[in-house]
């Protein structure tokens, strides 16, 4: 294994999450600030080493995040699913963007966001959260991947539960597949022009807004849509750090018997 570094992987993750909570999304800015606290960080690594090790430890960070989420919300039977556009550059610069050129299977793409009515170049963040707002699973796909394709992977992580979704996930074939393979009941509102139209169940419609609130908090407090990454691995690591920070702040509220959604005031 080689020499064990004094600045451990957990230290790298902790520093990354702390920077995200403080709104420091520039590594140069972070290490300029750390110069004032050299006595407290005797084994601090260089900025380049931190950048490399944060990319190498984002899977460990996600594994820890899932365990924390399960500790808070492990017995949940109802979940919400939705997607959020992640723009990597302006639409006019999409063809010149070099992100993912060496990894075609992970490269961004042109896509359309129906809720905002805009075209963009980048990725799409898919997430599944419980009714209390705890994100249990998420993934990044190219912007041109339909939301339904993400649901085909959900059946390997969830079972015997109900998932509330919007009309983008409406598919009789998908609903049947999820129920037959993992006993997942996908609740999707009907379209107005459908012959079998039925009014939406109001409690489900209200509960489905929970994940929209999570996305709003991630964008507001943790600046989810701000991106300075040059490569796909760096972007994935940053997204993982932001969502992990969100989960840790919820956990701090959880152990202090405070509302999980008050993430801005978790450390007050």
Predicted regions: what they are:
Residues 1-268:
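Short alpha-helical elements
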């Amino acid at each position: 294994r080689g020499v064990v570094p004094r600045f451990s992987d957990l230290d790298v993750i902790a520093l990354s999450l702390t920077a995200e909570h403080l709104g420091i999304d520039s590594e140069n800015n972070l290490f300029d600030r750390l110069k004032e606290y050299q006595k407290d960080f005797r084994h601090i690594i260089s900025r380049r080493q931190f950048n490399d090790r944060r990319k190498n430890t984002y899977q460990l960070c996600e594994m820890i995040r899932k365990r924390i989420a399960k500790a808070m919300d492990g017995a949940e039977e109802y979940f919400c699913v939705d997607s959020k556009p992640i723009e990597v550059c302006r639409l006019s610069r999409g063809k010149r963007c070099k992100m993912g050129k060496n990894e075609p299977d992970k490269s961004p793409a042109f896509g359309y966001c129906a809720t905002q009515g805009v075209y963009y170049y980048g990725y799409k963040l898919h997430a599944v959260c419980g009714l209390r707002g705890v994100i249990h699973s998420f993934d990044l796909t190219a912007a041109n991947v339909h939301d339904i394709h993400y649901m085909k992977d959900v059946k390997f992580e969830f079972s015997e539960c109900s998932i509330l979704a919007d009309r983008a996930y409406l598919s009789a074939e998908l609903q049947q597949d999820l129920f037959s393979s993992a006993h997942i009941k996908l609740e999707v509102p009907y379209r107005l022009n459908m012959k079998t139209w039925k009014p939406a169940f109001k409690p489900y419609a209200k509960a489905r807004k929970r994940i929209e609130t999570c996305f709003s908090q991630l964008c507001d407090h943790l600046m989810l849509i701000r991106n300075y990454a040059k490569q796909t691995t760096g972007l994935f690591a940053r997204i993982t750090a932001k969502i992990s920070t969100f989960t840790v702040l919820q956990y701090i509220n959880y152990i202090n018997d405070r509302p999980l959604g008050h993430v801005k005031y978790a450390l007050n």
